[in-house]
Amino acid sequence: MQAMSTETFIGNMRGPVVRRMDADYDAVRSLYNGMIDKSPMMIARCTDVADVVASVNFARQNDLQVAIRGGGHNGPGLGSVDNGLMIDMSMMKGVRVNPTACTVRAGPGCTQGDVDHATHIYGLAVPAGIVSTTGIAGLTLGGGTGYLTRKHGLTTDNLLEADVVLADGRIVTANKSENADLYWGLRGGGGNFGIVTSFLFQAHPVNVVYAGPVFWDIEDARTIMQKYRDFLPGAPEELGAFVGLKTVPPMAPFPAEHQGKRACAVIACYNGPTGDGQAVMAKLLEKLPPPLFNWMGEMPYPALQSMFDPFFPKGLQWYWRGDFVNELPDEAIDAHIAQARNAPSALSLMHLYPIDGAVRRVGKSDTAWNTRNATWSMVIAGIDPNPQKAGEVTRWTKGYWEAVHPYSADGGYVNFMMDDGDDSRLKATYGDNYDRLVALKDKYDPTNFFRVNQNIRPLHS
């Protein structure tokens, strides 16, 4: 078969195809992580499934490497590729809510904010992350942790169905009864098996929540982390609360007298009656020293989801590392605090996201996501707007991770991997599910067409 020409491909596309000579090329190819700069040969800006199929067929016939962009929030820049084809689905943002069935169908270009906007008017939400600019596609396929995780599970646990374009250009549906093996692999296996063009989610009742951040001086961090560690297992699952080592942002609306201080924070969300949330948090706060400030209060759920957006715009320098954590002994807490004191910038941070509760009620082999017994998913992120500090934030992150990794469980969250997602790391992450994922890759993508990702290589690639 003769390979599709560029002219034919462009003619087959409803959306624009952006090339290097085009005026908007640099703007379109730019990535969320300003530390990463890639130069694709072409960018296919898909508007529908037919555009995605045309892009896959063109790339396959012309032996082009492809990268898949959904919401465009990928940390290691895996949504782009040098000298290949970026299949950009960021314009495919449709959201349809079925309030009777409590389900949501979302396009692959949607961000969490897009989904929250559509669901909130019905008093519903899909469990997702903590920043509204996060793309729902990569979040779901890699796992998805956030404020609702303890009560309702991972984002991927709430995926009911997906429409997928395979490497050969076929379109299939994956759910419990149709292509069930692919449905299994999509829930945690990343973008290894195809391009998801439609996600069907289970949504849950969420409207106004009792939520917000509480900050303490880092001198109190040991006590805060100890009491938080001891409190969490007995806390109701309606409480989603993560602990972080951060810096009070040097900007309004944060109190001027505390701006720039190294801090320990608990950012919490209680999805239930406000009085119940206040009572639950009081049981934790009464054990702790007085905070620098406590901004917990009633707010619409989307307001909580977007609270941190202004601090993390597109284009910052990012380097992150993560681990799963089962226990948090005092020695680990001390190691965390020692590293956090030397944070290279005001934006650099460490967060421990709880992944107990509902996550543990799913079997280890029920989805590709294998980690069902951990307590937290940890991320360490070196962040700064200045490109000259890229090396410094990277070194700090790696050093911090090396200091606390001995206290971690096996593997890490694939959405928190950068350049550390090699075969051994992925095998540790997927555990007993890894061989099954390789077999699935052999079936659905035997040539490793989809390889610009945290890659599970087929057996004979």
Where are these regions (language model features)?
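Soluble FAD-dependent oxygen oxidases
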Residues: 1-461
